[in-house]
Amino acid sequence: MNRIMLLVAFAAGVVAAGRITTNQDRVQGIDRMSLEDLQLQKFILDIVQNIRQPLQQSELINLDVGLIADSQRYRGGIDKVMHNVIDLDRQRRLLDEHQVYSVGRLEHVQQLRGIYRLLARAQDFDTLRRNVVYLRRNINPVLLVNALALAIRDREDTQALIVPAVQELLPELYLDEEVIQQVRSVLREQTQRPSLMDIVGMRQRAMNPVMSILMPWREIHMQMALRKQQNIQNVLGQKRVVVRAENQGQVEGTSLLTDDIELQNFVQNLIQELALLEDVTQLEQSQLINNDQREEQWVGRQRVQYQDNNQERDLGQDVDTGRLLRVSRRRLLEQQDEYQGQNIYGNQKDRFQRLLRRDDDNDDNDDDDDQDIRMGRVQLQRGISQGGLRIGGAHNLPTVSVNSDRLLHVSRRRLNAIQQDQQQDQLNGRQRFMGLVRGDRLSEGRRVGQLDDVRQERQNNWQKQDYILTQGRTFGVQQERQNYADQLESVSRDDERLVHINRRRLNQDNQDIQQQQMHFPRRINSIGEGRRVMGERPIQDEDILKLIRGENRLKLMTDDEILEMLQRNRQQRLQKHQNDDDDDVNDDDVNVVHRQGLRSRRSLPNLRQQNNRLSEIVLHNLRQLVARLNQESIAQGQLIEEQQQLINNPRLTQSERYALRLNQIRINSQRSRQVLAQIGQIEQRIQEVIGQVLNQVNVNSLRGQVIDQRQVESLIADVLLGRLGQVGIMTIIRQVVQDNNIEQIDRTGLGIRLSDPVVQYTLRRIVRIVDEQREQILGGYRQEQLQMRGVSINDVRVDKLRTRIEEHELDLSNLVEQQVQGIQQEIVGRQRRLNNKAFTIDMDITSDQDQDAIIRIFLGPAEDQQGRQGASLDERRRDFVLLDAIQVQLENGRNRIHRRSIDIPWTTSDVTPLVEIYRQVMLQLKGQQAQQVVGIQQLVGENGRFPQHLLLPRGRPEGLPMQLLVVVSPLVELQVQDVVPAITIGIGSASLRDARPLGYPLDRPIHNEQELLQLTNVLLQDVVIIQEN
């Protein structure tokens, strides 16, 4: 017997020697935290506990010193987004607790981005702590929790800390109103109050009449104290209250997937990432254009350049010059907009009315105010007053010290403007009117009869300046520019102070060039870029070559050289455009090391951060989400494609199509036509924008290597993010919400839920349009792009896949206020959900050499969306989900790879309740002083990953037929690592290290399924999923 046991142990050791395990400890246990980390963790828990209630801890309240606005306390200084949040806080315009936070609103997303940067870029944890305490007491709790979770995730000194799950901190965001009222009614029933009969004493014994006269309220106080003591005993006897936190019919259809709280949190995180990655929208661009136009009208382009040079010459290197320049320019525009288009007498009348209202506020100083009015000594509003009054708005403005550097630069700018006005008046020989002329604005001291003459003179001056700037051939203007240039200080081209104004001047130069090209076109230009000839056919390089030869240009170059030059120029412009987009969108949100007190040189290539894979990650998550919806529908026998084919039947009339669509998406008939028309317009806009973007790219050059083909995927993803074409998915979501917010509304403020049929229909259509555009351009993979020589998959073994419906508990203590002081009552919501049994995948792979490889594992249904068995893999590939991607180092010979489902990195297990996290932290803090606490489990908090219990679709009692696709490919690492984080939302790090598309190889059409399955590095195996209960 002993010999048999030895043989078995020896065999197990031999097998284990050739096994490659990929089980990695992804979560740090609390028992390995240092004392400092435990104290920081306790601070985070104190902040988020009872987030809806006012902060009670005095030691935390003492840390509130306001929002820190010192640029030296932040890595990289304070940028425009952060400064906008600081200004909103000074004006008390940040989102407060009485307002609803929504990622569908642009201003809310901008506040989230700014608060996140204030927390993530804090120089030390003390700055982070003070800002968090101030924000905890002054802003919306949903906004604070989202920003804090992102900052804790991205900071280097908080990697060991966790934030409790959002669904426990803010459960009202994910529960229905009926569940919330049920929880609060249960708590009201436990808190008994004395009845009226008890208060008046009719049910009590009669007391001494003398005592009742001397102490009339003694009996009432005794009864109240007795009732309160009974309530405390009731609560002590029932510390755990369990309520049912689900709706009727939650296990029907796909509701187990769409109504799952963890999945709703994942979708909210995905939409939040979409909002944070969204580029400048049409609203922002229109605002920027309007600001530039107003600035050119009132100040003049020559004056702006001259003053910018003077300011940049005088500013020091250690000062945040870009912020000061933007502040002064913004204030000048606000001041001009306030008085633009108003009547002169109306301005004067309104100012005196504001002055009288100011007198009412200070009744004690009426005599002094009257004297100030008579003497003309009244407080000015952000400007210089000569011969007129400019009163009002001083109470709402932030106070600034008289020694502040901001006032120095703003005053110097205004002084230069006044001097230029005087010089311009002397040159033109105009008479000075009474009052101050600022930026060609009419003074209040001018007479009304002179209004038409002055306006005509100003219009003539504008036309003359515009003509001079457009033609650029007036000797006097050139001489004046030369004189200005001679007076400026010469600085190095790499000087940090020039970075902030280079982009603005570059845009102005481009506008000048475009205006000159309208009158004098250049000899060599981008001929016909984006235009179409011969009907709908886009212009090609050969057409441009014909135009060049027809005009007898570039005679010394051959046709091949001209075509090569056009192709090279187009690729350079495309690469430059992508780099500029990557710098503008999210270059500050990745982990970038900045020098303290200085802004990063975003225009320099050595610090440019490539993050274009972020758009691919978002698009990949959308595809995977739609595939899971399709899998759940197929598992429940809901035929999607059958209804789609009926809708697209050409024999049906338009009214019949509308009727079928109404039956499919089940929306209100009164708004059905508007919603469907809006969705149709969205689909058309997406197709047009993607077509325009891809027509500007030389697709023939991208059909070679797989790395080059990924650029098409990145371009399409940029369109969905709104970075190209201005038709991003957030714009689509906002439009759908606007048309669908009457009946389908949730407490997140977004207005949509994944269970909404309109949302599912829109997502499916968007993903289908994107896939069709990509497949039409790139086609399928070639055989050499799919095979891996010298590698063969011998066998793949999978455990039995089983799913079950179970009851899950959710901590709802933050949903209600604790009525009893000193007693923390645990309120638990019980909900049914779908879960799966943990399984393992064993793969036996043979390699002829040592090499790095990546293994992709896909899971998809064996049936198509019409319920047909035996459908081709090409018809079902869009319904496959990427279970895992593993990076391994294959050795020469046989390799056994063992993978557990609980080790998939982009999924998360059940979160630890807030009460349990707090208890473990406090026990560990005590253990640091006395003895270590043994047996502490790993804690799981908010991480934004996909819930692990939804990894498999709901099975069937007889077994749901599924297929497992395993593909082994050589690892093609990117030369420049685009995405550094090890784990991102919905995707693992192994897929990001590989240069192939994230959906490879099922993201392209499969023309020959047999040829694909005959490859030695590809294996397709049948599996079944059984529903236990």
Swiss-Prot record:
UniProt note on tissues of expression: Fat body.
GO molecular function, one term: nutrient reservoir activity
Keyword Transport: no
Classification via SUPFAM superfamilies: E set domains (SSF81296), Hemocyanin, N-terminal domain (SSF48050)
Name of this protein: Fat-body protein 1
GO BP: any one term: energy homeostasis
GO cellular component terms listed in the entry, alphabetical order: extracellular space
Signal sequence extent: 1-17
Induction comment from the UniProt entry of this chain: By ecdysone.
Pfam families: Hemocyanin_C (PF03723), Hemocyanin_N (PF03722)
Listed InterPro entries: Hemocyanin/hexamerin (IPR013788), Hemocyanin_C (IPR005203), Hemocyanin_C_sf (IPR037020), Hemocyanin_N (IPR005204), Hemocyanin_N_sf (IPR036697), Ig_E-set (IPR014756)
Transmembrane segments: none
Xref: PANTHER family: FAT-BODY PROTEIN 1-RELATED, LARVAL STORAGE PROTEIN/PHENOLOXIDASE
Keyword Disulfide bond: no
Keywords on record: Signal
Organism: Drosophila melanogaster (Fruit fly)
